[in-house]
Amino acid sequence: MNSATLICQDKYAAQKLANLIFVNDTKETYVTEILNVVENEVVLSIKDKSAHSVVLEDNDQVLLFTDFIQSVIEKKQKIVQTETVGSSVVIVKE
């Protein structure tokens, strides 16, 4: 398994990111595409075709997230767990 810890702008952004990318009850990944990146903000498209933005701490966190989530978007890997701790999100994929 592979994991990444991302630091968001605040606790709210961390909870939003965790809920947008993965739903624990159904084990589904909702993110289908990264639509745009503007500085430390990532705009994501989810399964229902809606767009949502999440603000991460800095550009390094954006690079970490976009690199980590790419294999999930390409359906090469699946997210199996997300956990928020303060303004951080731990994402685990297999």
Tell where the protein language model's regions lie, with residue ranges.
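Short acidic DE-rich linear segments
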Residues: 84-94
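Periodically patterned hydrophobic/aromatic "hotspot" residues that form packing/interaction faces
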Residues: 17, 42, 62, 89-90
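Negatively charged, low-complexity tracts enriched in Asp/Glu with abundant Ser/Thr
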Residues: 2-19
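Short glycine-enriched loop/turn motifs at secondary-structure junctions
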Residues: 1-2, 48
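Extended, low-complexity, intrinsically disordered tandem-repeat tracts enriched
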Residues: 10, 58, 91-92
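Acidic, low-complexity, intrinsically disordered interaction modules
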Residues: 24-83
